[in-house]
């Protein structure tokens, strides 16, 4: 069977959330369904899934703010790792971003995720010195820090 890369459809939600859980991408304070709802309101064409035989086997969210592009939630089903699914998803996200005029794409990887770091290295992504910071404005679930005010 071949892998199809296409835009996320609402019927994909349960499968995508399960995929993110399997891949260890979810956190208790970050409701994945809320992330999906928010993404569908902003550049939904940059939310992609990989499908084989009617089943979702991969996903990636991308975004472009006019300055930089970002990749989020890249995940591949364990049964499909090492088969080019993640590479195909990144390539399509990059193609769409470039078509929008995006000059550079960035992403964040947890420091202990050596597998992801090696994957992105192989795709030509280079680490750079920066201090990544964040400020939570909305808490989606229990266990997270309260919103900063």
Q: Predicted regions: what is each one?
A:
Residues 3, 7-73, 77, 90-92, ...:
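Acetyl-CoA-dependent GNAT
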Residues 5, 109, 122:
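Conserved SAM-binding loop
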Residues 58, 115-119:
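A short, acidic/glycine-rich surface segment
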Residues 70-73, 108, 119:
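Residue-level recognition of specific faces of alpha-helices
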Residues 78, 107-116, 134-139:
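Conserved beta-strand-loop-alpha-helix junction that forms the acyl-donor binding cleft
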Residues 82-95, 118, 122:
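Conserved acetyl-CoA-binding loop-helix of GNAT-fold acetyltransferases
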Residues 97-109:
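Conserved GNAT acetyl-CoA-binding A-motif
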């Amino acid at each position: 069977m071949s892998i199809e890369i296409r835009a996320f459809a609402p019927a994909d939600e349960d499968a995508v959330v399960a995929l993110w859980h399997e891949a260890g991408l979810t956190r208790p304070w970050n409701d994945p369904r809320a992330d999906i709802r928010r993404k569908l309101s902003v550049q939904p064409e940059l939310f992609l899934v990989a499908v084989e035989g009617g089943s979702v086997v991969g996903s990636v969210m991308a975004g472009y703010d006019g300055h930089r592009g970002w990749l989020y939630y890249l995940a591949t089903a364990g049964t499909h790792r090492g088969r080019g699914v993640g590479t195909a998803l990144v390539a399509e996200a990059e193609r769409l971003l470039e078509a929008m005029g995006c000059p550079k794409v960035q992403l964040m990887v947890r420091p202990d995720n050596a597998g992801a770091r090696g994957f992105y290295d192989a795709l030509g992504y280079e680490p750079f010195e920066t201090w990544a910071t964040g400020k939570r404005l909305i808490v989606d679930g229990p266990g997270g820090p309260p919103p900063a005010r």
